[in-house]
Curated annotation (Swiss-Prot):
Name this protein carries in UniProt: Large ribosomal subunit protein bL36c
Source species of the chain: Capsella bursa-pastoris
The family this protein is said to belong to: Belongs to the bacterial ribosomal protein bL36 family.
Gene: rpl36
Keyword Chloroplast set for record: yes
Keywords: Chloroplast, Plastid, Ribonucleoprotein, Ribosomal protein
Primary location recorded for the protein, binned into one broad class: plastid
GO annotations of cellular component type: chloroplast; ribonucleoprotein complex; ribosome
Subcellular locations according to the entry: Plastid, Chloroplast
Any single GO BP term: translation
Top-level taxonomic group: Eukaryota
InterPro entries in the cross-refs: Ribosomal_bL36, Ribosomal_bL36_sp
One GO MF term: structural constituent of ribosome
SUPFAM superfamilies xrefs: Ribosomal protein L36
Keyword Plastid attached: yes
Length: 37
């Protein structure tokens, strides 16, 4: 999980999701997981 100021999709399978007021990226590739700080 990378914590970043700006999250964006890295590949086609990345999905942007809002959870508990935070923006997250979930993907089938675990390296692409991100969360907005």
């Amino acid at each position: 999980m990378k914590i970043r100021a700006s999250v964006r999709k890295i590949c086609e399978k990345c999905r942007l999701i809002r959870r508990r007021g935070r923006i997250r990226v979930i993907c089938s590739n675990p390296r692409h997981k991100q969360r907005q700080g």
